[in-house]
């Protein structure tokens, strides 16, 4: 696999992992996610001309989907990461003489509280960093530590973290052994996604502030003092004058993490003076005046009691460790990931071993290795990978350098359920009213087997099931009906074709294919002609779309659109387009000069396309213009200069767009 293909694969993987994480169902440990990001970052540094566009490393947060969307007054950004004392020292060197507060990095759900003339008027989740969800009703009902009124006039915005305390989490699970919560972080996120506060009334959350924005003179310049004056608690803050003091504070926080009543996954360093913090400004996706120091993963020892093998939507079979219960990072862990058989062999892990369980980033536990192989008793048992699929009994195959196992039986029951869940996911058909548990039950009952079967469901059929009432059944059917307008791009995502990523689907939608059937008929030669689609991806598309042709026909018969949607097409070029015939590359953070608001790079690229340009992801000899925003990378500038590419500031392009009445 060449560098370009690997970069595209990693970029698509990051999008997939982020979506799962923010849906409350993370697929990998934080450490594994960080490794994917780090590999992509290193490849882009080595091959800046191959940087993906949009670049997921320039984006923050989760897609906002619940409740009414609200645009933030200023972006809620992620924090730059640090893991070494040298990085802490470098942070202090950037701001000589400025005091810094160090506080625990809480592991919950970020919120923005907006007060106007002393009254709470809105509570909004971080969402995608630019737009979040209005959860005011839920916050008022369920979140402690949020005053309804404050003694400050004008507009005040307090940002912070809503967490479920460990004591609340343990008490809830003790009272609900049949439906325990997974961990406090997921519980906090799930609570504020509830449709009705009454359904989650026992799940109390607690708010801790970490940011404050007021009119001039509206609060103390010192962050901690400003929050306290409003009656809002902040996570314990320590004022530090230099890097040595800050590192000592970080060490103290890490040592005391198990004594806290809330989960943390690091420490935050931030300029103590609010004016200095604001003056420091931002990068494309993080504030300059703050830093997140990530702790090493928490580890505990326990006994590996058994290994089971789970089957995914593409037939991939992965080992899952079943563990003697152990308390790690604020939750009791009974299972963990083992990745694949190569990892098992490399770490020489056996059933019966005392193993190290690591909860990286305090999210997904995994087996890091054997504590001491020399102390084995001889009763330990080798972990033998299956030769048959644990779901359907068909022979398995090995693929790739990691010798990953796959079931190739398209009718495998486990794959069927996973594929149905994937079709209903947000990235695909977005059938949000039917969760995975109900999809599994409907599949077990023989009602659902293929995506097209969703569109034969009736309210009367759903009401035959226990625990589905009139309201739930109506919501399910309405959700299914809304999904009929899925279109080419999202339908292709939903069909879970191996090697065909979300990026593949987007490129096909923009390449002139009118429908999914036309893609199926295209043949490998035409597919390879599409930008960034290689022979392996083309072969996979041909093979699987040929197999799925009867399913495409059933979807059509049941009123599902497989045609390309207007939103996925290249934009119509305006008459007298100022950038006609130009190939452009956009780099850096883009902001609308009329409002000062940040503009997503894909949005700006689409505006350039309306102005007649062809947007490319990397600088080459064919590039006409490199359009630069804030924080532009030196590597792209150097390459553009070397190739003789004209470099223009975004302000010049904005002026042309405004004059052409394209914005």
Curated annotation (Swiss-Prot):
Catalytic center residues: 105
Residues reported in the UniProt entry to bind NAD(+): 30-34, 78-79, 126, 161, 294
Its EC number(s): 6.5.1.2
Catalytic activity, as annotated: NAD(+) + (deoxyribonucleotide)n-3'-hydroxyl + 5'-phospho-(deoxyribonucleotide)m = (deoxyribonucleotide)n+m + AMP + beta-nicotinamide D-nucleotide
Name under which the protein is recorded: DNA ligase 1
Protein family (similarity comment): Belongs to the NAD-dependent DNA ligase family. LigA subfamily.
Originating organism: Nocardia farcinica (strain IFM 10152)
UniProt KW Ligase keyword: yes
Gene for this chain: ligA1
Keyword Zinc on entry: yes
Positions with a binding annotation for Zn(2+): 389, 392, 407, 412
GO MF assignments: DNA binding; DNA ligase (NAD+) activity; metal ion binding
A matching Pfam family: HHH_2
């Amino acid at each position: 696999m060449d560098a370009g293909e690997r970069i595209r694969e990693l970029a698509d993987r990051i999008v997939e992992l982020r979506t799962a994480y923010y849906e409350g169902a993370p697929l990998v440990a934080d450490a594994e996610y960080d490794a994917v990001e780090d590999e992509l970052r290193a490849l882009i540094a080595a091959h800046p001309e191959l940087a993906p566009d949009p670049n997921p490393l320039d984006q923050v947060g989760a897609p906002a989907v619940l409740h009414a969307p609200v645009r933030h007054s200023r972006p809620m950004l992620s924090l730059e990461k640090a893991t070494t004392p040298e990085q802490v020292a470098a942070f202090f060197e950037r701001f000589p003489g400025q005091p810094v507060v160090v506080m625990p990095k809480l592991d919950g759900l970020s919120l923005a509280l907006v007060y106007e003339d002393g009254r709470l008027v809105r509570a909004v989740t971080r969402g995608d960093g630019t737009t979040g969800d209005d959860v005011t009703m839920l916050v008022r009902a369920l979140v402690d530590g949020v005053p309804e009124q404050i003694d400050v006039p004008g507009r005040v915005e307090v940002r912070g973290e809503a967490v479920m305390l460990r004591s609340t989490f343990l008490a809830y699970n003790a009272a609900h052994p049949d439906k325990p919560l997974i961990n406090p972080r997921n519980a906090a996120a799930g609570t504020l996604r509830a449709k009705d506060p009454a359904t989650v009334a026992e799940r109390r959350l607690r708010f801790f502030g970490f940011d404050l924005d007021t009119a001039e003179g509206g609060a103390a310049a010192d962050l901690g003092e400003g929050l306290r004056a409003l009656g809002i608690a902040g996570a314990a803050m320590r004022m530090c004058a230099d890097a040595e003091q800050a590192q000592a504070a970080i060490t103290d926080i890490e040592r005391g993490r198990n004594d806290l009543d809330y989960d943390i996954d690091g420490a935050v360093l931030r300029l103590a003076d609010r004016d200095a913090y604001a003056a420091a400004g931002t990068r494309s996706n993080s504030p300059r005046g703050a830093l997140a120091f990530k702790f090493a993963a928490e580890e505990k020892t326990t006994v590996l009691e058994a290994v089971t093998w789970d089957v995914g939507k593409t037939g991939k079979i992965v080992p899952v460790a079943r563990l003697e219960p152990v308390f790690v990072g604020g939750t009791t862990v009974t299972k963990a990931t083992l990745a694949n058989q190569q990892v098992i062999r490399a770490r020489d892990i056996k059933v019966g071993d005392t193993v190290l369980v690591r909860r990286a980033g305090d999210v997904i536990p995994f087996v890091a290795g054997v504590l001491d192989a020399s102390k084995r008793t001889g009763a330990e048992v080798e972990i033998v990978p299956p030769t048959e699929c644990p779901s359907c009994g068909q022979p398995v195959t090995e693929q790739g350098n990691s010798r990953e196992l796959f079931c190739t039986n398209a009718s495998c029951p486990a794959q069927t359920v996973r594929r149905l869940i994937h079709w209903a996911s947000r990235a695909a058909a977005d059938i949000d009213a039917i969760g995975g548990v109900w999809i599994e039950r409907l599949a077990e009952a023989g009602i659902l087997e293929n995506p097209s079967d969703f569109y034969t469901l009736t309210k009367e059929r759903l009401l035959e099931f226990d625990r589905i009432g009139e309201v739930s059944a109506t919501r399910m059917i309405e959700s299914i009906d809304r999904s009929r307008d899925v279109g080419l791009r999202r339908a292709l995502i939903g069909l879970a074709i191996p090697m065909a990523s979300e990026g593949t689907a987007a490129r096909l939608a923009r390449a002139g294919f009118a429908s999914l059937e036309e893609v199926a008929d295209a043949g490998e030669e035409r597919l390879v002609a599409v930008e960034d689609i290689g022979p392996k991806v083309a072969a996979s598309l041909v093979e699987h779309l040929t197999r799925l042709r009867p399913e495409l026909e059933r979807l059509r018969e049941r009123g599902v659109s497989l045609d390309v949607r207007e939103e996925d097409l290249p934009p119509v070029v305006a008459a007298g387009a100022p950038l006609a015939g130009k190939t452009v590359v956009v780099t850096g953070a883009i902001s609308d000069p009329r409002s000062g608001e940040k503009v997503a790079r894909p949005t700006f690229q689409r505006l350039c396309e309306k102005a007649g340009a062809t947007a490319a992801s990397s600088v080459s000899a064919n590039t006409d213009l490199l359009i630069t925003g804030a924080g532009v990378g030196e590597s792209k500038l150097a390459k553009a200069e070397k190739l003789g590419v004209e470099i223009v500031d975004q302000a010049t392009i904005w002026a042309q767009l405004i004059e052409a009445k394209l914005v």
